[in-house]
Amino acid sequence: MQPRLGGPALLLLPPLLLLLLLGAGGGDCGARAEVLFRCPPCTPESLAACKPPPGAAAGPAGDARVPCELVREPGCGCCSVCARLEGERCGVYTPRCGQGLRCYPNPGSELPLRALVHGEGTCEKHGDAEYSASPEQVADNGEEHSEGGQVENHVDGNVNLMGGGGGAGRKPLKFRMKELAVFREKVTEQHRQMGKGGKHHLGLEEPKKLRPPPARTPCQQELDQVLERISTMRLPDERGPLEHLYSLHIPNCDKHGLYNLKQCKMSLNGQRGECWCVNPNTGKLIQGAPTIRGDPECHLFYNEQQGARGVHTQRMQ
């Protein structure tokens, strides 16, 4: 029987989700024996519909002179975009990092994998970041998050659901499941300790009272529901095809937990995902804003909506 990932251990879910969306890059033959999904091939029609990336300049003969490194769109898109450079922000919804770079969370982040969901990672060279250590090294250093938080951000379209790094250092699926089980126990114990309230914690005579966690915003609650839904899937045989996972709408929340004005579906089958505009507080569709495979310029419709509400308020006074 395959183990299940459910219950309070939602912190275990972002590694699986991020590696699905970012597309972990290549590894050795042993790594490819693990659970892999591949993006479907791009059709000639899809490639012909692609436009030059914003960083490309038109040459004298109409050819594009590209001053940036071109990488594939996030998800399973077929068009090219400019890769993120070393030191630039990166994450689930951003273009991939350039060759030789990976997307790492900031070393001081308490929830590194959630930070990558919000695009708060940084493109760095492999081995330069603190999170490039193996799970054992991180555990020996006393780090609380034993998964290490490392996420590859390469471009070959292979998606590894079970790993946070590539190359010969990868471990078999059996060992990773054991590591996930150990981490789940740590999270469960942490929740148990937090539920003790005013009791003495960790043997301290005068422990600080634990503050109740801040209320989850609607966007964060919706994201938690999506992660919970993924957690109830069996690993790995009932994970389902790639198209099924990409059919889930993953809300795009900002660092404050509000909805980003522009929400998009992930690219699939060589087509860009549709984008639409929502109210940052409620996530509801902004009336009159288009749903298109591109930039709907949500700020224009949101400002117009806010202006109309201001006029209505003045008339009521």
UniProtKB/Swiss-Prot annotation:
SMART domains per record: IB, TY
GO terms for biological process, alphabetical: positive regulation of activated T cell proliferation; regulation of insulin-like growth factor receptor signaling pathway; response to insulin
Span(s) of short sequence motif Cell attachment site: 293-295
Domain named IGFBP N-terminal: residues: 35-126
UniProt signal peptide: 1-33
Subunit composition and interactions: Interacts with IGF1. Interacts with IGF2. Interacts (via RGD motif) with integrin alpha5/ITGA5; this interaction induces cell migration, adhesion or apoptosis according to the context. Interacts with PTPRB; this interaction leads to PTPRB dimerization and inactivation.
Protein's name in the database: Insulin-like growth factor-binding protein 2
